Amino acid sequence: MQISLKRLLPFLIILSFALSLHAQETVKILRVVDGDTLKINYKGKQESIRLIGIDTPESRVNPRAKRESQRTGEDMKTILAMGKEATQFVNTLVKSGDKVSIELDIEKRDRNGRLLGYVYLSNGKMLNEEIVKSGYANLLTIPPNIKYQDRLVRAYREARGNNRGLWK
């Protein structure tokens, strides 16, 4: 049975497109900005990457921290302390110079121009999921970037159920 190249070519094109949609790329960590944002070297440029699906407390006074304080009823000092704790936790998982893999989802950038992605540590674990599982982040689901929503929900329930991190 011989398959002609003409018949095989469309299949190969579709396959390569499908594989590239969620391809991982290796990047270097430059620094941890806060609990859900990193600076990375991406394609030769310094870029910010916002971790998809998670939201850690703010670690600096800004309008978002004020809204968070109003929404939760926590004072600003508590919000900032929780944000710093989340950032410190992320710093235990990634350091400047570390090589990690990133996977972008459907929407590649947010309105601030930051990359939106899932970050994989050298041990293969997803950083986004590890932060949630350890209790240092809430869930933040923004369609269409929902590829790993179920994993993150399970991690969140596990953290809350076991009083981990900020849920102590």
Please identify what each model-predicted range represents.
Residues Q2-F11, L19-K168:
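Small beta-barrel nucleic-acid-binding modules, primarily SNase/OB-fold domains
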